[in-house]
Design a protein with these regions (language model features):
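Short "lid" loop at the C-terminus of a central beta-strand within the Rossmann-like core
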Residues: 8-9, 55, 148-149
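Active-site HxH/HxHxD metal-binding segment of metal-dependent hydrolases
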Residues: 1-33
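Binuclear metal-ion centers of metallo-dependent hydrolases, dominated by the metallo-beta-lactamase
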Residues: 33-38, 129-218
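Active-site-proximal loop/helix segment associated with metal-binding centers of metalloenzymes
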Residues: 42, 47-122, 126-135, 141-143
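Hydrophobic side chains in beta-strands
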Residues: 5, 65-67, 216
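General small-molecule cofactor/ligand-binding pocket signal
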Residues: 4, 29-34, 50-52, 206-208
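A short helix-to-beta-strand connector/capping loop
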Residues: 24-29, 44-45, 117-118, 201-204
Length: 218
């Protein structure tokens, strides 16, 4: 199992294991988060995950999830028409031209674009800070904390949290397509006020709730 957390957590895990004489039947790979700069946490054929520093009263990170550019889709009728083999298809889908029976085949002539790569940024807990924008520029969806409404802007600054308006400003500056608000203070009964406030700056805004799910379209 891979664990990503502040470095001091490893001391706690080790102390717990020593006291309890715990022996895992799996490998535990501990990865200390970097609170000073962006860091790649995960990378496979489909997805990349990055952490980036945010501005809070204790060291804290945001996270960026980015799908990699997908393979192109082969036009099925071309397989039989051109006598394409499995190896040829693989090359063409990966944007490589190939030679089939002495004939040059361009990938653009026999494939169509695949699904659009999607992206999602999670920004919490954090004070309003435009320094995060380069890390999340052009992201599809941003989740940004909005602990307070604008009437408590000063309190938000002191406690290093954000208002709904400030979350909207981040989404607008980052050129995001959608903003999800969350981390609301318990003092508020009407969460819709957060959406109303943020929507005056960034129209495509919704509020998260327990069990909230959102499908990012390709």
């Amino acid at each position: 199992i891979n664990v990503y957390a502040p470095k001091d957590l490893l001391n706690l895990i080790n102390a717990h294991n020593e006291i309890s004489e715990k022996i895992y039947n799996f490998d535990l790979n501990f990865n200390a988060l970097n609170f000073q700069k962006s860091n790649k946490l995960y990378d496979d054929n489909i997805l990349e995950i990055f952490s980036f520093p945010v501005n809070h009263s204790v060291p804290c990170c945001g996270f960026l999830f980015k799908e990699k550019k997908s393979q192109r889709n082969i036009i099925k009728t071309k397989i039989k028409d051109l006598g394409l083999g499995i190896g040829d298809i693989k090359k063409l889908k990966n944007r490589e031209n190939c030679l089939v029976n002495g004939k040059a085949i361009k990938y653009k002539d026999v494939t169509v674009p695949g699904n659009k790569a999607r992206s999602y940024a999670y920004c919490a807990d954090t004070k309003y800070d435009k320094k995060i924008i380069p890390f999340i520029k052009d992201v599809d969806v941003i989740y940004h904390e909005s602990t307070f409404l604008e009437e408590l802007k000063n309190k938000a600054s002191k406690t290093k949290h954000s208002t709904a308006n400030q979350a909207a400003e981040i989404a607008l500056s980052a050129n995001s397509k959608m903003l999800i608000l969350g981390h609301f203070s318990a003092r508020y009964d009407n969460i819709e006020k957060f959406v109303q406030e943020a929507s005056s700056i960034f129209k495509n805004t919704v509020a998260a709730y327990d069990g909230f799910k959102y499908q990012i379209k390709n």
